[in-house]
Amino acid sequence: MLRVTLVSRSDHTVLYLPEPRLMTGFFLSLTLMPGRASVNCQLIRKKRYPMTPDRYKKARQVLKHRQPDLTVIMENVHKPHNLAAVIRSCDAVGIGEVHAISSIKYFRMRQKAASGSGKWVNINIHRKTSDAVQQLKNEGFGVYCAHFSEDAIDFRQFDFTQKTALIFGSELEGVSDEAVGLADGNIIIPMMGMVQSLNVSVASALMLYEAQRQRELAGMYERGIIEQDVMDKVLFEWFYPDVAKYCNKHGMPYPALDEDGYMAEPLKDRTGNIRKLP
């Protein structure tokens, strides 16, 4: 069934028509004047992920399992396939927000390696390691480096049920001395071969799945600790990013979504007045 969001005024009517099988939509603006009518149709989505009621319900379930008290800091990890693989692992274990430290303004990920996970995980970019570490410590996180040292903890013995941020370093040099100095400790993956390190994407996957194992045993995936208003905001931005951008630009609240993920009300400004779209 095609759902239509209608905004009506005496001289202007706006419809938002989501295509039911793909996340594609149109803003259809009809201006009515005596003796004539003009129509302006604006395509706001060209290619998006499929949006069906089942996919919307799946997204809600995913958010209920999110682990906001577990995150990753990628320090100068620049290779696109490594970035994508780490973020894919984060999404798989329920991490919805990660941090990256780099002087490069824009990250490039290989979509094949990410398998679309970049859409579902928010990336916070920091220019300095100290900025990221201090922010997370202020939020109550314990910060630990994936780094070999004499006092490093075997990742299988580390308590991942605590509020934890893991720092993974660059492909060639690992984590920086600055990161080691700022962190609360180091965690290692025991190695029995000639080499003393794993690829960053492999190391992160091993540690994150150990974290998932511990948290699942502790029942932490059933907590549902993300507040409802935050969940509603994230869902709207996931499935209607262009409309969300329009709302943010014009200071408008997001329209409510119904149980199937369709917009259930017209767009309104902060004073409650119905707004017309360009």
Model-based region annotation:
Residues 12, 17, 27-28, 41-42:
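Short hydrophobic targeting helices and cationic amphipathic motifs
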